[in-house]
Amino acid sequence: MATKLQDENTPCLAATPSEPRPTVLVFDSGVGGLSVYDEIRRLLPDLHYIYAFDNVAFPYGEKSETFIVERVVEIVTAVQQRYPLSLAVIACNTASTVSLPALREKFAFPVVGVVPAIKPAARLTANGVVGLLATRATVKRPYTHELIARFANECQIAMLGSAELVELAEAKLHGDSVSLEELRRILRPWLRMPEPPDTVVLGCTHFPLLRDELLQVLPEGTRLVDSGAAIARRTAWLLEHEAPDAKSTDANIAYCMAMTPGAEQLLPVLQRYGFETLEKLPV
């Protein structure tokens, strides 16, 4: 049986569409960006999608800003050298907060970032308590506090930074079950509040992958808000108004930075998302 798993020197085996389509790169340090890609694909199903994830340097939340900027620019450059891009989505909150200026300076195509959905959450809350669930890096960054001051200064913001949730989301996509008891332990600071958040911002693209489990643990009626739909709408607008005419007839493809057993285990998941082939990107 022919395998769809390939290294960088093997030609793509997947059937290719006949009509040229705009090429969109979705990038994350791990698989969390698939939640953003899924929203974009629902709105724009007929694009040529490339998903790239940095399984060598994952997770980014513990890396320095200088490292993240240099690494993201290097990876996007490597993809651009293989496929002329119409647009890139940096589907990682940590990378978005630090790398967008460098990317926009280097590349002519639009680059879309991800920011915590604090503004819509502040509008939705009924009790005035908004939870921000993110990585520790996102919780600490000045940009996050600027968003809160600008859009949610009348709300009580309960921030919870967790790297463990990122690992749980990755493990779920690898086929592991998610421990609700572990989730309760992570969310205990909120669950013990006299008035817990009624609206929770999923401030990491991994966290929508845990939506069902989070709703089982958080108080009944809690709203979960993320940026996926807004990013999809922004992508559609930019492709129509500002993106270069970079089109491809190739099939959707996923890139990892190292062909590890863990990356190989993701192939069935990537195929469910429409990526028939996984290759190692030479960087």
Swiss-Prot record:
SUPFAM superfamilies: Aspartate/glutamate racemase. Keywords: Cell shape, Cell wall biogenesis/degradation, Isomerase, Peptidoglycan synthesis. Substrate binds at residues 28-29, 60-61, 93-94, 205-206. It catalyses: L-glutamate = D-glutamate. This is Glutamate racemase. Provides the (R)-glutamate required for cell wall biosynthesis. GO terms for molecular function: glutamate racemase activity. Belongs to the aspartate/glutamate racemases family. GO terms for biological process: cell wall organization; peptidoglycan biosynthetic process; regulation of cell shape. Gene3D superfamilies: 3.40.50.1860. NCBIfam families: glut_race, PRK00865.1-1. It is an enzyme of class 5 (isomerase). Pathway: Cell wall biogenesis; peptidoglycan biosynthesis. The active site is at residues 92, 204. Its EC number is 5.1.1.3. PROSITE patterns: ASP_GLU_RACEMASE_1, ASP_GLU_RACEMASE_2. Transmembrane segments: none annotated. It comes from Salmonella typhimurium (strain LT2 / SGSC1412 / ATCC 700720).
